[in-house]
């Protein structure tokens, strides 16, 4: 018997504001593809501006998945994301189309592509409650520091504001004596798909300028009104509100900072996130990097994917 044919998947990664959205749509048109969002925050309805969600006009008729599937009050674990995206890949492939994942969130994308197993076996409800209480009494940074002490790799990857995941990593260490990062490292070697990974990068100063401009544009487009709607609706302490662009504006609405300080912090956090995204992808995955400082590289990237996945684009006919 021959080897089972693995499903082909193209993945576009890179820091926020680097130009992934336009490239993904150009590639989808050329490669008969459909797009799956690999951004863990674009799943939330009504959170459009702050997540830089693709608009209907930008989609230009290309089907998009994993967008607007949950309410902001809902949680959505990496395991649920993994299951949902794999289902999208299966269905898109069955239609004779190429799945194109656009990200996004490093761990989430990695969990889809590699043979990650998520288990709830390691659990200690009493310990979890203790950590939740400590987070309430002493703040999220306190429990994040505890994680830094026992599992610095996970602490680097998990933002302090993502309390649920911080406590989960602590709980795994407490229960098994093993770092969560070690458990994941053991599992991530085998790719489940025939993958072409495309990474976009650009000159850091130019990228940071683009991020600052994007934040200014978000404010002009109505980010304050979008966040105010969530705030007035009573959305609090949810996974969704930990997203960059929301937690900073929440601080403004709750009179902890001025609007100027909130916007400045949003820009700073966005730049830091972009740096973390690049570090993650460079350390974890075999990526074909394309520097788009001097402009788009769509034709070059198209040829790269065609070669990697042994495909013919509409442009090649």
Curated annotation (Swiss-Prot):
A GO biological-process term: tRNA modification
Alphabetical keyword list: ATP-binding, Magnesium, Nucleotide-binding, Transferase, tRNA processing
EC number: 2.5.1.75
Family annotation (InterPro entries): Dimethylallyltransferase, IPT, P-loop_NTPase
Binding site for ATP: 14-21
Cofactor: Mg(2+)
Site feature: Interaction with substrate tRNA: 105, 128
Subunit structure: Monomer.
Name of the protein described by the UniProt record: tRNA dimethylallyltransferase
């Amino acid at each position: 018997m021959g080897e089972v044919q693995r499903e082909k998947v193209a993945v576009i990664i890179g820091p926020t504001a680097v130009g992934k959205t336009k490239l993904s749509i150009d590639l989808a048109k050329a490669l008969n593809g459909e797009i799956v969002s690999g951004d863990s925050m674009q799943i939330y309805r009504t959170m459009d501006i702050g997540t830089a969600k693709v608009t209907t006009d930008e989609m230009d008729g290309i089907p998009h998945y994993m967008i607007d599937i949950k309410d902001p009050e809902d949680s959505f674990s990496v395991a649920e994301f993994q299951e949902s995206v794999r289902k999208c890949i299966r269905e898109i492939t069955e239609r004779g189309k190429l799945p194109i994942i656009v990200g996004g969130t490093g761990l989430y994308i990695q969990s889809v592509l590699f043979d990650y197993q998520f288990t709830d076996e390691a659990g200690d409800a009493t310990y979890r409650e203790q950590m939740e209480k400590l987070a309430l009494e002493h703040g999220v940074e306190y429990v994040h520091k505890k994680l830094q002490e026992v599992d610095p790799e996970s602490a680097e990857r998990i933002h302090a504001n993502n309390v649920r995941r911080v406590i989960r990593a602590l709980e795994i260490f407490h229960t098994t004596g093993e770092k969560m990062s070690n458990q994941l490292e053991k599992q991530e070697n085998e790719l489940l798909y025939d993958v072409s990974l495309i990474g976009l990068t650009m000159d850091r100063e130019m990228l940071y300028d683009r991020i600052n401009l994007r934040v200014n544009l978000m404010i002009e487009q109505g980010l304050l009104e979008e966040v105010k709607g969530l705030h007035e609706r009573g959305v609090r302490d949810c996974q969704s509100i930990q997203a960059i662009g929301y937690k900073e504006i929440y601080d403004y609405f709750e009179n902890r900072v001025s609007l100027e300080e909130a916007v400045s912090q949003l820009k700073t956090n966005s730049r830091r996130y972009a740096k973390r995204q690049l570090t993650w992808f460079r350390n974890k995955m075999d990526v074909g990097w394309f520097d788009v400082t001097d402009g788009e590289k769509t034709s070059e990237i198209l040829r790269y994917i065609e070669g990697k996945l042994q495909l013919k684009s509409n442009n090649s006919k």
